[in-house]
Every structure is written in C-alpha cells, then in structure tokens.
A protein has these predicted regions:
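Transmembrane-helix motifs of polytopic, lipid-linked glycan transferases
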Residues: 21, 99-123, 163, 167, ...
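Hydrophobic/aromatic-rich transmembrane helices and adjacent perimembrane loops
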Residues: 205, 331-383
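Extracytosolic helix-loop segments that constitute the early lumenal/periplasmic catalytic or substrate-binding loops
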Residues: 28-33, 45-72, 79-82, 89, ...
Length: 523
C-alpha cells in the first residue's frame, strides 16, 4: 500500500514539474522568438507598442482597446496597458511588451494546480494531488492559451485573473480571519474586477454581474453582521479607484463611451437580433459550449465532426458525474457556475458570425474542472464508474495529444528549419541597410499606413532613419520573409499553417540571405 501511495505521489510530482517546465518554456522562453508582432487584419500589437512608448513620454491612456471588435463605437477600460507597462522598462523591444502576458499565463499553471486542489475537498490526499497536477499539465499544453499569450493582446491574462477572482471570493465566504484581512481581500476583489473588465468585452459585460450576485449572496449569508455586510462596498470603491483614468475620461466626455456601449446593446442592427425562441437560444448556448471542444481541446486543421462528437460525449459524461457525485468545495464551483451560466445566456444572444475561441475564454477552465472533478468522485469499485473513468482518461489523453501536436507546430515556426521571421531577425537584417535608405513595405497601407512594424522597429530599436514606403522605388531595399503565417480567421483561430511567400514582381538584386528571409535591393 505504501509503495502504491508513493507511486501516486511520484506521478503527481512528475506531472506538476512537467506542467511548470513546459509552461515556462512555451510562455516565457519562446516569447523571445517573437513572430506575431504583426498578424491578422488589425495591427493591434504595433498600435499597442506605440502606446507603451508614448506612456514613457507621460501620455497615459484613459481608454482601452475598441470593444466588440471595433464595430460598435465603444472601448473597454485601459488597465491592460497599465499591466503591460512596467516590463517595458527593460527596453523598447516588443518582446518585453508581451512578457507580461507570458508571466500571467505561466503563473496560471501552478495557480490552477492549487485551485483544483482546493476544489477537490473530500478526496484522499494522494488522489487529490495527482488530479490537481494532471489539471495543471493538461492546461499547460493548451495550444490556444500558448498562442494568445505569445503576443500582446488584452484577453490573454483573463484565465489567471479568473482564478484569482474565484479564490478571493472563496476566502471571503469561508474565512475566520480578522476583519482587517477580510477588508484587504475585498479591496483586492474589487481591483481584480477592474482588471477583468479591462481585458475584453465579454468580461466587461459579465464580470460585473457575477460580482454583484456574489456580493449579494455574501451579504445574505452575513445578514446578522452589519459590519461584514458593508465589506463589499470596499470592492466597489477599489474597483472604481483602479478605473480612475477611465472614469475621468467618461466625465470629461459626458459619458460618451457608456452611451456607445448602451447603443451597442440596445439598438437594432448593431448585431444580429437574438431569437426569442427559448429552444433556439438554449440550443445555441449548448452548441457553443460543445463546439469549444473543437476550438480549444480537440484540435484539427479543419472543422471535425469526429471532434464535435468527442466533445459532446466528454461534456455529457463530465456534467452527468459532477451533478450526481460532486462533493467538493461548493463556494468555488458555485461561483464559477454562476459565471458560466451568465456567459451561456449571453452567448445565446450572440450574432451568427464567427465565435472565436478567445471570446469563450471564460469557459476555458470548465472542461478541465468538470473532467477532473468527475475523476475525483467516481467510485472505481463499480464497473460502470470504471468505464466512465476510462472514457474520460482516453479523451483527456486525446486532448493533450492534439494540443501538443499544434504546440509543436508553433514551436517549429519559431525554431525549425522552415521558420517565421521574428522581431530579432528583422532587427539584424535592418542593421545591414545603410542609414537613411528607403525600405519597401507593401503592407504599409490601410490600418498600417501610419504605423507599420518596420516603422516601430526602426524608430525605437535600429534607429537607421529609414524612409519606409509602400511605393517601392528603384534603389529601395526589400525584406522578403521566406514564410508567412496563414492563420485561420474563423472559428478555428488561432490554428495556422506556414505558407511560402512570393517575391515582388520587380527586378531585384539579392544582397543577403538568412534562414528566415532575403534582403533585396530593387533595381
């Protein structure tokens, strides 16, 4: 028996170490091969880079990125920019701007292990340790989390702060610590709310509702203690103080952003009109949950009916077991369940367009927590429970395997023989171009006309005083990456493939070849 226990603990330790080591390499180390500084239709990373440099000049943002994909005339609060700002003290390199995301993603792995351990009450110690480590390792392999935390993007830190959000609420509901500690926890609860509403439109709309419901439940549970009932007001105060710059802007602008948000939520035509049919809305909420498996947990280059079926079986079994057998911490699971239900209600109103995986980021932990809780409370002395457990383990293994495959592809695009051009590679090439030369950039148009990637790199890093233009006159220089990222801008985002680039249809002289690119001079 003792040897069996030692094996379980040893396996738990190995899984925990693997989770943290893999997360450290993918979320921290590989950031410095930064290949996503300029991807997609919008140059968000470049715009953010300029904004952080402006902050060093004393220009502090009062509003954040556009909400709702920039289609509805409102923005989210600006705290993401303030989260990313401190690490830019190390330099203007874009890698330091994304390092904050990498750190939060890395820290979310041990935090998830701790969270799951707290969740699995009434489970024997060794099993609890093993399943907590399994949850951490599983999440460390999630390709979608790896990808979005390897470039500068506001939604990326949501998983970390959701864990903090839930753990703080559990502390408030269950602690016997002195009132001072409870007051401090409520202050941090409010700051966490302020951060979460500053990361994405979904959190901006859903987290305040969750926090109000949670606070009202806290007040109800402590209704005989007047002083404790006043504690949630500390979170309201701290949240609004954290959002001081945003509220200052709103007051000065006569609440223009709030009015834009209200218009987006109420005006017909701002989005597809939601169905009033209860069955239709319920089906959409269920479908978007099941389809999350195809987007985050069971990956394929194309939409896969097989993966959708696997996801449906997986969710069905997990939900059935948790509803029937769960005996863990009710505060944590209840808090998350409220958030998930509010999100699912909101998703049933979502217009019929691409529902990208990052827009479902509040659900990302749900499959992991449901599956791990299911394994924790199955009675493995019963044949039926053993069969269910085996099915779940096989599906979890399949999820880890498919994600590791896409992790490997992403790593190969950074370190393989056929790889993308990184910021560091670009700097090395630009340093070979004579000072004051003209650099041809065909992408410098539309949203990139003002600020393209070469503009930023030369202004703040290489300082070669280049003239960057999309006109490409004779005598100008042209950098041709050997490969580009062909990313799927649909429900399968951020899956991508490498595509060979085509040379300019101009006579050119080759000056330099690196493993990632060519440098030409246009004749």
């Amino acid at each position: 028996m003792g040897k069996s226990i030692n094996k379980v603990r040893g396996t738990a330790l190995i899984l925990g170490i693997l989770a943290i080591a893999f997360a450290f390499f993918t979320r921290i180390v590989s950031i410095f091969e930064y290949v996503t500084f300029d991807i997609g239709p919008d140059p968000d990373q470049i715009s953010g880079a300029y904004l952080w440099m402006d902050m060093w000049k004393g220009n502090f943002p009062q509003l954040g990125p556009p909400g709702g994909g920039g289609k509805y005339g409102f923005t989210i609060p600006p705290l993401y920019f303030y989260l990313g700002f401190p690490l830019t003290i190390f330099g203007a390199d874009p890698e330091f701007q994304v390092l904050t995301n990498g750190l939060f993603s890395f820290l979310s792995i041990p935090l998830l292990i701790y969270f799951v351990y707290q969740l699995l009450e009434n489970v024997e110690q060794d099993k609890r340790l093993l399943l907590s480590s399994l949850a951490g390792f599983w999440y460390s392999t999630i390709y979608a989390d790896y990808f979005i935390n390897n470039f500068s993007w506001a939604p990326s830190p949501i998983p970390f702060f959701m864990l903090v959000f839930a753990l703080l609420y559990r502390f408030q509901m269950e602690t016997s610590q002195p009132l001072l500690y409870q007051a401090i926890a409520w202050i941090f609860f409010g700051i966490t709310v302020a951060i979460l509403v500053s990361l994405h439109t979904t959190t901006m709309l859903i987290i305040p509702v969750t926090s109000v419901i949670a606070s009202l439940w806290f007040v109800y549970r402590n209704r005989k203690n007047t002083l404790k009932c006043l504690l949630p007001f500390l979170s309201i105060l701290s949240a609004n103080l954290a959002l001081f710059m945003y509220w200052h802007s709103e007051i000065v602008r006569n609440f223009a952003n709030t009015k834009g948000l209200v218009r987006a939520l109420t005006e017909k035509g701002a989005s597809a009109e939601p169905s009033s049919n209860l069955f239709t809305r319920l089906f959409k909420a269920i479908w978007e949950t099941v389809y999350l498996g195809n987007q985050v947990f069971f990956l394929n280059d194309n939409i896969s009916i097989f993966n959708v079926v696997v996801s449906a079986i997986f969710f069905g079994i997990s939900l059935y077991i948790v509803i029937k057998k769960y005996r863990g911490n009710k505060t944590l699971i209840g808090f998350l369940a409220i958030t998930w239900i509010i999100f699912l209600y909101a998703s049933s109103n979502y217009p019929d367009e691409h529902f990208y995986s990052h827009r479902k980021i509040l659900l990302w932990f749900a499959p992991i927590l449901l599956a791990i809780a299911s394994l924790a409370y199955l009675n493995l002395t019963k044949t039926f429970d053993r069969i269910l457990g085996l099915v779940l383990i096989i599906i979890i293994g399949y999820s880890i395997a498919t994600n590791l495959y896409f992790d490997q592809r992403y790593l190969a695009s950074k370190y393989g023989s056929e790889r993308l051009l990184s910021v560091a590679d670009t700097v090395e090439i630009i340093n070979q171009i004579p000072v004051g030369s003209t650099l041809c950039d065909p992408a410098k148009k539309g949203k990139r006309k003002e600020h393209g990637q070469y503009d930023y790199i030369d202004t703040f890093m290489t300082k070669r005083e280049l003239m960057i233009t999309n006109a490409c006159p004779s005598g100008s220089y042209y950098i041709q990456p050997k490969f580009k990222m062909a990313i799927q801008m649909n429900d399968l985002f951020p899956i991508f493939t490498l595509a060979k680039t085509s040379p300019l249809d101009r006579p050119m002289t080759s000056l330099l070849e690196t493993p990632e690119a060519y440098l030409y001079k246009i004749e």
